[in-house]
A protein has these predicted regions:
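Juxtamembrane luminal stem/stalk of type II transmembrane Golgi/ER carbohydrate-processing enzymes
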Residues: 1-32, 270
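Active-site-proximal specificity loops/subdomain of glycosyltransferases
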Residues: 15, 20-26, 63-136, 143-148
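Short His-Asn-centered micro-motif
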Residues: 31-36, 59-60, 135-138, 162-165
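Active-site beta-to-alpha loop of glycosyltransferases that engages the nucleotide-sugar donor
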Residues: 33-47, 51, 61-63
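Conserved catalytic core of nucleotide-sugar-dependent glycosyltransferases
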Residues: 140-269
């Protein structure tokens, strides 16, 4: 068992080690994330997790969430990867803008994540309900040993909430939780069954508590002794903010790509 799971909790209580059972066959690990310009972190993720992850679903859009043009550049980078990594990648190119437009940045962001989840699942074949769906942003990398344990064992809840080690500008510069808003957990890992039943494969809902509103579905899970309360796992990976080459063009791209409606930025002022 990975050491990080020894202190994992559900509703504040640790799970007994006897809860976990070795599977007769491994389940598939599906890792999905949107991509913008973080080529270095993408390479780190792929090389670190390729031996555990069965499918990487990567979404690239030809427009930003602020509505500006965003040239598709990922395909030409992926061909340089070794085949044992490249063969595990499902690239989704998003070319249809959100129907609501870009005036509401949060809605535009939700449209991006919804497309990632639903279109990615639509293109997969032979999905099993106990497969594991891992949803992160492109600057977040879960620990390989955690995913390997989930791949090989049963006994954990239908979803996991991860606390990631946060750093800025590079993995070497970690943020002290005391000054970084405290220890934060985000829902990020779930069974395909949970993803289907509670979110209809809409990844924009993964980091919310919207599942708690579906009382009828929760009762169905309880009736068969299945837990939907997320298991919290501390220090379950890395979140490296602003970790890319310090070029002005990349900085401008980052700022203008993700600014929501309440935070409009003009490149003329940068």
């Amino acid at each position: 068992m990975p050491s990080i799971l020894q202190n994992a909790t559900v509703d504040g209580d640790p799970l007994p080690w006897s809860t976990y059972r070795l599977r007769s066959r491994p389940r598939r690990i599906i890792s999905a994330f949107p991509f913008n310009h973080e080529f270095d972190l993408l390479e780190a993720r792929l090389y670190d997790l390729h031996h555990v992850v069965d499918v990487f679903i990567i979404q690239e859009s030809n427009f930003t969430n602020a509505g500006s043009a965003n040239p598709l550049r990922l395909q030409e980078q992926l061909v340089t990867l070794p085949s044992y990594i490249r063969d595990k990648i499902l690239l989704i190119e998003r070319t249809i803008p959100p129907a609501e437009g870009f005036s509401d940045g949060k809605m535009a962001d939700a449209d991006m994540r919804r497309h990632l989840g639903q279109e990615g699942v639509r293109r997969l074949s032979d999905i099993r309900l106990d497969d594991i769906y891992v949803y992160n942003d492109s600057d977040e990398i879960p620990r390989a040993e955690l995913l390997l344990f989930l791949k090989l064992y049963d006994g954990f809840p239908h979803q996991l909430s991860l606390n990631l080690i946060w750093s800025i500008y590079g993995f070497f510069w970690q943020v002290d939780p005391e000054y970084g808003g405290g220890i934060r957990f985000d829902n990020a890992v779930m069974t395909m069954k949970f993803f289907r039943d509670f979110y209809q494969y809409d990844a924009s809902k993964v980091r919310t508590d919207e599942f708690t509103k579906n009382k009828e579905m929760i009762e169905k899970y309880k009736a068969v002794n299945e837990t939907v309360t997320p298991m919290k796992v501390n220090r379950a990976g890395w979140h490296c903010s602003w970790c890319f080459h310090p070029e002005v063009s990349l900085l401008l791209h980052r700022v203008t790509s993700f600014c929501f409606a309440f935070c409009r930025v003009s490149t003329r002022n940068l």
